[in-house]
Amino acid sequence: MSRLTWDAVGEKFYEMGTKLGVLYPMNNTGAYDKGVAWNGLTAVTESPSGAEETKLYADDIKYASLRSAEEYGYTIEAYTYPTEWEPCDGSAQVATGVSIGQQKRQGFGFSWVTTVGNDVDDEVGQKIHIAWNSTASPSEKSYATINDNPDAITFSWECTTSPVSVTGHRPTSHMEIDCSKLKPATVKAIQDKLWGTETAEATLPSPDELIKLITDSEGQV
């Protein structure tokens, strides 16, 4: 046995950045269409909710506590968005270059990447985040006059999710993959699936399909 140590060299980890966003629009059958790159992504803010405590009392003392179901939400911020996002934001094209709002909002999946660094290297690895079964709420758009300190409009959308099944676990709508703990071949297989290749489209697999892909790849010698 050894005494605990803190802040050893190479063990001061942190996470930063948001990049490589991918949108996976959901079609009328509930399946995801091919992924499209999301340029201009500036932030993704995770905002889980729920898991609220219900206290139970018996014999004049606290007997137990129950927790409500947990929900996963997130906010996307960006300078722009792909055309495929418009139906997810409640817009419809009615003529060339003409769109209308207040339409049915299309579901979607979304993935993005954050960077892991430490005190030795500011890019030790990456984490791939995936959200399934999402819908976006209407958001404010603020337009202002151009002045001597111009700035681009930042769009923002609050997104909610409905969980999907995961074999052997409770349903979930979010997965986080720490690439630094996986073989390079496994990371490439995940990226090829989510981002596509020269011969295959970018697709969004289910949680079970991703888990199988990872476990099969990690099990190979």
Task: Tell where the protein language model's regions lie, with residue ranges.
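Short, charge-rich amphipathic segments
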Residues: 2-9, 24-29, 78, 87-94, ...
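Structured, beta-strand-rich domain cores
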Residues: 62-137
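Short amphipathic beta-strand and strand-loop transition segments with alternating hydrophobic
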Residues: 42-46, 62-64, 135-144
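Mixed-charge, glycine-accented linear interaction segment located at domain edges/termini
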Residues: 138-221
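Polar/acidic, low-complexity leader/linker segments enriched in S/T/G and N/D
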Residues: 1-46
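Oligomerization/assembly interface segments of phage tail-like spikes and tubes
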Residues: 46-48, 53, 57-85, 149-163
